[in-house]
Amino acid sequence: MDKNLLKRFAIESKKDLTKKIETKIKSFFIDEKFEETQIGDIYYLTNNVHTLTLIPEDYKKRKLLIDRVNKLGLIQVIEEATFTWFNRIIALRYMEIHDYLPLTKNNESLGIRVLSSTDNTPIPEIMKFTNLVNPELDIDFKKEKYVELKDDNEKFKYVLLLVCKKLGNVIPQVFDGMTDYIDILIPDYLLNETGFVNKLITEIPEDNYEQVEIIGWLYQYYNQIEKDKAMATKNAYQKNEIPYVTQLFTPDWIVKYMIENSLGRYYIEHNSDSYTPIINKFKYLIKDNICFKSENTNVESITFLEDRKSVV
């Protein structure tokens, strides 16, 4: 895993996505005066420069976006949308490489990639029409709407939103289906040479995804600039700065070390007959001073809790 590459990619991508989403959010006349007209089901919002055309669904999402901006402020909503799309697309990339995407009604994989193609063509596999009309693909795909869209970037955004909505029912922590105001801020031109998806595919080789740790490292590097600024300027932090200086990614070996020398040691000491088979599997256990207890403990009865103060 090339951590220097991941760091550079995460920092540059955050800057680029932030600019694009800031431009996108302002295109919805969030803080501008405009004239609104409605013809049939279509809404037209016009200022002195251009006209924004919205279908009823997007008109509703725009109102939700305005409510969110009024509640949190423009800057925080931009940060929220930027991270959400960064996080979603990184997760999709990891899952498609490992064939984890639950795209059927039974949440099983179809072996179809969403962001890329195994034959290295620039169009993602899911956009091939035979895949879109696959009866096992459980997304709310509308052929007529797809055909009406102007270019591959618009078609891809349409399909990507459908996939995220599907995954929101399976992995709501990442693909929350209740973020309509963020959905309309999906970045444009994702498949272009300088688009986030294209750069993700072309700049980070697939072998970097062999370990799930890549997601943790990208998350840490995504926050690197804010973390460095906060730590360099003060000893006391504002509420919004605390995550940057406290939420650090824990590498896999540290997690294993902590578990093997806490829960693992406790279990071995209370189950002496399990010592040999378990000890051969534990790579990080400190074997000195293991004191066996007379009573056995059922592993299912052990509560393992991590909190802010300690690991029990």
Where does each model-flagged region fall?
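Preference for the N-terminal adenyl/adenosyl cofactor-binding alpha/beta module
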Residues: 1-312
